[in-house]
């Protein structure tokens, strides 16, 4: 919690300075800092709630297309500042999940995709692809996998096995952007609590793909 409090103070101070020293400037810079604050506060809140997640669950039908659009809308400032464009494909699927927790997970993954975009690419070349696929039925169940793929800087191979560890920032977090090391940890833990599978593949200089697999029985689909 202390780490979050420290990180929250920085954008608050920056927002105050921008507002005080540049009263005639557009509000974009202030909005950017406030978006950072909202993201950090959201992480802190979901971390606190994760201890009693069973009491906060509400599993129901979730339209992937709608929840992805909501997550992107709430992260619009992050994408604009990073010059990243979202692309969609085959999201017309309904899954069983808690919409609040799933949207939080998506927002964290989308923030990371924008934060670690490739600085050598022009704004129109920085892309995040969001897509989904449904598996063939097997032993009474089927699964839907949601993919968040980017063409960013990628994750060093030696960091891949630790990116879901609590507090791990890795080389990218230290070099390119300030990181609490809690976003991906929370995503992984919340996925486990909802019986979802979160995986990642990445190559430095090429980008990363995060996958969320949601299993469903035939009775869930009826």
Task: Give residue spans per PLM region.
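Acidic ATP/Mg2+-coordinating residue in the GHKL
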Residues: 150
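Short helix-loop "hinge" at the ATP-lid/N-box region of the Bergerat-fold HATPase_c
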Residues: 113-117
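Short conserved segment of the HATPase_c
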Residues: 155-167
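Glycine-rich GHKL/ HATPase_c ATP-binding element in histidine kinases
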Residues: 206-210
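Short beta-strand/loop element within the Bergerat-fold HATPase_c
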Residues: 125-141
């Amino acid at each position: 919690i202390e780490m979050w409090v420290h990180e929250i103070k920085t954008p608050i101070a920056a927002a105050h300075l921008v507002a005080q020293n540049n009263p005639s400037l557009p509000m974009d810079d202030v909005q950017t800092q406030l978006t950072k604050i909202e993201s950090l506060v959201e992480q802190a809140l979901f971390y606190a709630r994760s201890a009693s997640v069973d009491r906060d669950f509400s599993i129901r039908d979730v339209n992937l297309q709608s929840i992805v659009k909501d997550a992107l809308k709430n992260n619009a400032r992050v994408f604009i500042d990073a010059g990243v464009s979202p692309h969609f494909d085959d999201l017309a699927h309904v899954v069983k999940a808690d919409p609040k927790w799933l949207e939080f997970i998506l927002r964290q993954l989308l923030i990371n995709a924008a934060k670690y975009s490739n600085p050598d690419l022009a704004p129109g070349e920085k892309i995040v692809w969001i897509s989904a696929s449904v598996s063939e039925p097997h032993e009474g169940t089927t699964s839907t996998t949601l993919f968040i793929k980017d063409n960013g800087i990628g994750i060093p191979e030696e960091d891949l096995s630790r990116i879901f560890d609590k507090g791990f920032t890795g080389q990218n977090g230290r070099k390119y952007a300030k990181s609490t090391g809690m976003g991906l940890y929370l995503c992984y833990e919340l996925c486990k609590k909802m019986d979802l599978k979160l995986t990642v593949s990445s190559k430095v200089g090429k980008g990363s793909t995060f996958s969320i697999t949601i299993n469903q029985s035939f009775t869930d689909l009826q």
